[in-house]
Design a protein with these regions (language model features):
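Predominantly the C-terminal beta-signal and adjacent terminal strand-loop region
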Residues: 294-320, 325
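Outer-membrane beta-barrel architecture
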Residues: 2-4, 38, 116-120, 136-138, ...
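Flexible, surface-exposed loop regions and adjacent strand-edge segments
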Residues: 56-62, 227-235, 279-283, 316-319
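Outer membrane beta-barrel
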Residues: 1-151, 243-272, 276-283
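Hydrophobic, well-ordered secondary-structure elements that form the walls
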Residues: 253, 264, 287, 300, ...
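Detector for outer-membrane/organellar transmembrane beta-barrel domains
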Residues: 144-148, 152-272, 281
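Short polar/acidic secondary-structure junctions
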Residues: 112-114, 203-205, 292
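Outer-membrane beta-barrel "beta-signal"
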Residues: 139-146, 150, 314-326
Length: 326
C-alpha cells in the first residue's frame, strides 16, 4: 500500500510526564508513493541524530547514550542510569508539546545507485520548543550513506546481530530560532544542534562486530543564564545555559556470537560552564543473550557516570532486564 499508520503507547511515570498515565508516544501516517519520496506526518521522532532514528526495541547497550538527550525536545540535558535520570547540573529544561517526539512532518527517501552504494535523506519541520509564544518552527535535516548492505527504512537498529555487512556515515542539523529567552536579560535565544556519525557491522572470525560513534555540538547562543519562557520565568529544572551548551561524543561496540553479545559504551560531554560545571563522562559494560533476536532477549549491564560539576556525586547503576517485542 502507498500509505500506512503507526501508533505506539507507553505507561508513563517520570519527572517530565504525569505519573501513572498511559500516553501516546508515536502517532503518524506515512504516505509512500515512491521509496525515494515519502511523507511522514504526526507525532514522530525528529531526524536530529542517528540515535533519534534507532528503534527503541533494538538498542545494543540497554538504552540510548545519555548524551543523545541534548537534542531539543529531549530536555537539553545529559542522562544517567541507562538514560533514565537527568544528570545533576546539566538540564536546560526545554521540552515541546510532546516529550522526546515532536509534532510535524518529515520528507524522507532512500535509494541505491548500485548494489553496494545506498543513500537516504530526511527533511523535517516541527513545532519544537513551546517555551516562547513565537511561531518559529523547528527545522531538521539529515543525510546518510551506506556502503555494503542498505539501511533503507526511516528507523534503523543499533545492532543487526550479524545479518548485515555495512559501513554507514551520517550527518544532521537541527535548529529553531527564538525557542527560548534568557531568563535574566529577556533576550531571545536560538537553538542549533549538529552531529556526525559512523556505523559499521562486519563479520569477524566466528561472529559479527558492531561499532557506532557520533560527535555532537549544541549551541544556545552562548547564553550564560538559565533559559526562560515568554514572561521570563526559568524553564523547569533549568541550570545556567552554559552548563548545557557544549559538545560531546559517544562510541559503542559489541561482538555477536552464538546468540551472545558482550558490549561496551563510552561517552563524554564538555559543557561551556565554568569550573567543569555541566561536564561529565560515562561508560557502560554488559552482556546480552538473544533467544529470538530483538523480539526476545535478556540484558545485564553496569554503568558508571562521572559527574564533574562541583559538588555533584558520581552514579553507579546495575541493571538486569528481559525484553519482549510482539
Amino acid at each position: 500500500p502507498w500509505w500506512s499508520m503507526f501508533l505506539q503507547t507507553e505507561f508513563s511515570d517520570d519527572d517530565v510526564n504525569s505519573g501513572g498515565d498511559v500516553r501516546m508516544i508515536d502517532a503518524f501516517i506515512t504516505f509512500k508513493p515512491r521509496d525515494w519520496f515519502q511523507l511522514i506526518g504526526g507525532e514522530r521522532m525528529a531526524p536530529a541524530s542517528r540515535q533519534n532514528l534507532t528503534s527503541s526495541g533494538a538498542l545494543m547497550t540497554v538504552d540510548r547514550p545519555g548524551s543523545n538527550n541534548y537534542t531539543l525536545t529531549w530536555g537539553l540535558r545529559g542522562q544517567t542510569q541507562f538514560n533514565n535520570s537527568a544528570i545533576s547540573g546539566t538540564r536546560g529544561g526545554s521540552v515541546g508539546d510532546v516529550s522526546v517526539r515532536d509534532l510535524g512532518a518529515t520528507l524522507f527517501g532512500s535509494t541505491s545507485t548500485s548494489e553496494k552504494l545506498h543513500f537516504k535523506y530526511y527533511a523535517g519541520v516541527s513545532d519544537g520548543s513551546t517555551a516562547r509564544t513565537s511561531d518559529e518552527e523547528r527545522f531538521t535535516l539529515r543525510a546518510q550513506v551506506n556502503y555494503g548492505d542498505a539501511e533503507p527504512g526511516y528507523f534503523g537498529l543499533s545492532t543487526y546481530l550479524g545479518k548485515k555487512q555495512t559501513l554507514g556515515f551520517g550527518a544532521a542539523y537541527d535548529t529553531q530560532s527564538d525557542f527560548a529567552a534568557d531568563s535574566v536579560t529577556g533576550e531571545s535565544v536560538d537553538y542549533a544542534y549538529w552531529t556526525v556519525d559512523a556505523f559499521a557491522e562486519q563479520p569477524i572470525g566466528p561472529g559479527s562486530l558492531t561499532f557506532e560513534a557520533a560527535y555532537s555540538d549544541l549551541d544556545l547562543d552562548d547564553t550564560q543564564n538559565p533559559l526562560g519562557n515568554s514572561i521570563g520565568d526559568p524553564l523547569s529544572g533549568g541550570v545556567n545555559a552554559d552548563q548545557t551548551q557544549g559538545s560531546g561524543y559517544y562510541a559503542q561496540t559489541g561482538y555477536y556470537i552464538n546468540k551472545w553479545q558482550p558490549w561496551f559504551l563510552y561517552e563524554d560531554w564538555d559543557a561551556d560552564g565554568n569550573n567543569d560545571a555541566g561536564d561529565w563522562s560515562a561508560y557502560r559494560v554488559g552482556l546480552s543473550y538473544f533467544f529470538a533476536g530483538h523480539n526476545a532477549n535478556v540484558k545485564v549491564g553496569y554503568e558508571n557516570t562521572d559527574n564533574k560539576t562541583p559538588g555533584a556525586n558520581d552514579i553507579q547503576t546495575f541493571v538486569l532486564g528481559a525484553y519482549i517485542t510482539f
